[in-house]
Amino acid sequence: MAKKVSAKIKLALPAGKANPAPPVGPALGQHGVNIMMFCKEYNARTADQVGMVIPVEITVFEDRSFTFVLKTPPASVLLTKAAGVEKGSGKPNKEKAGTITGAQLRQIAEQKLPDLNANDVEAAMKIIAGTARNMGIVIAD
């Protein structure tokens, strides 16, 4: 018989640096999850992606056990890293924050493809290009 799900929790945590302090502790503690066990597993599975923010979806069962699924880093994090800027422009229509190449755009789209609502890389590139435009990042051809 399948276990009954008691909660689903979504968090965005720095890779390899999850610790019991907020926001992890309170989010998991209220559902009775072993926080240290989650932190150790998360840090082990994201050790190769240090420096990125990795969203995670945690499914908590009624017996207080849990499973979690790692997602791809947010497009905004990948774009700022590719453009070499700290954050997007406050006024994307007037001020440009940085520039990325078409090849970098394709690489980000391929990386994000599993989490995007797109069937192919071309559609994913359009989605990522829209995010870049809203951040004030120019795509050079």
Curated annotation (Swiss-Prot):
UniProt PTM comment: One or more lysine residues are methylated.
Listed GO MF terms: large ribosomal subunit rRNA binding; structural constituent of ribosome
Family matches, as InterPro entries: Ribosomal_uL11, Ribosomal_uL11_bac-typ, Ribosomal_uL11_C, Ribosomal_uL11_C_sf, Ribosomal_uL11_CS, Ribosomal_uL11_N, Ribosomal_uL11_N_sf
Classification via HAMAP family: Ribosomal_uL11
Family: Belongs to the universal ribosomal protein uL11 family.
Subunit organization: Part of the ribosomal stalk of the 50S ribosomal subunit. Interacts with L10 and the large rRNA to form the base of the stalk. L10 forms an elongated spine to which L12 dimers bind in a sequential fashion forming a multimeric L10(L12)X complex.
Protein name: Large ribosomal subunit protein uL11
Lineage of the organism: Bacteria, Bacillati, Cyanobacteriota, Cyanophyceae, Gloeobacterales
